[in-house]
């Protein structure tokens, strides 16, 4: 109703993707399933689930390869080369979003692989301790991708309409917000989410 799409997650438990894609399907495809950087066979399986949901785009949080809890896990996860990413982009058969970009070099690699968009994100600081804030690296990444057609999204502590304004001013095309929406859902259900959206819109308009 408000033009906001959900980014859903993935995990070592297969039910995470199953429930996420089920929810996206129930919402008429208004969601972006995010796949971890597993091995290619697992990615194919997850991608099939994602596409079956009718989603309008698919994402991969490539930085998740560095998450401590994924080490020595099954299925295995790991970093992806430009060539591997390009293969995954083709599998998606719809706009593909590379999440977890924190450098100009990474942004240009995503573009080379055929990504339609990137998410400037440090995974909440859980991949690399004491890494830069997304606001610190966003301007140079935005400058590097200017005129390429690649959309730039950003996350990282965005809570208010003023935060959204700052992100847009620094070069983002859009933002990702997580925790406040979770709080709104647990505190007030659907009505809580509506109230938070109204609050965001009002702050941004002001």
What are these regions (language model features)?
Residues 136-206:
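Alpha/beta catalytic cores of nucleotide-metabolism and tRNA/nucleoside-modifying enzymes
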Residues 1-113, 124-127:
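Active-site entrance/lid segments in N-terminal catalytic domains of soluble metabolic enzymes
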Residues 28-46, 128-132, 145-155, 201-206:
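Short, basic, helix/turn surface patches
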Residues 9, 120, 177:
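Short beta-strand and adjacent tight-turn residues that come in two discontinuous sequence segments
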Residues 107-110, 115, 167, 172:
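Small-residue (primarily alanine) positions within well-ordered alpha-helices
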Residues 75-78, 132-138:
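Charged helix-capping and loop-helix junction motifs
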């Amino acid at each position: 109703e408000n033009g906001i799409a959900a980014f859903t997650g993935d995990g070592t438990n297969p039910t995470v993707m199953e429930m996420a894609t089920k929810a996206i399907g129930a919402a008429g495809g208004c969601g972006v399933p995010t796949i971890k950087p597993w091995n290619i066979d697992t990615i194919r399986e997850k991608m099939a689930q994602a596409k079956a949901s009718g989603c309008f785009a698919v994402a991969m949080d490539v930085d998740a390869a560095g998450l401590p809890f994924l080490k020595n896990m099954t299925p295995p996860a790991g970093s992806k080369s430009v060539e591997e990413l390009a293969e995954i982009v083709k599998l998606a058969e719809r706009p593909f979003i590379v999440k977890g970009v924190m450098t100009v070099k990474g942004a240009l690699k995503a573009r080379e692989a055929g990504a339609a968009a990137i998410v400037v994100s440090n995974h909440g600081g859980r991949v690399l301790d004491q890494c830069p804030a997304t606001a610190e690296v966003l301007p140079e990444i935005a400058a590097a991708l200017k005129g390429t057609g690649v959309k730039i999204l950003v996350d990282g502590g965005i809570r208010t309409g003023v935060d959204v304004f700052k992100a847009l001013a620094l070069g983002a095309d859009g933002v990702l917000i997580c925790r406040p929406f979770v709080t709104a859902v647990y505190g007030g259900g659907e009505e809580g989410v509506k109230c938070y959206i109204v609050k965001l819109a009002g702050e941004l308009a002001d």
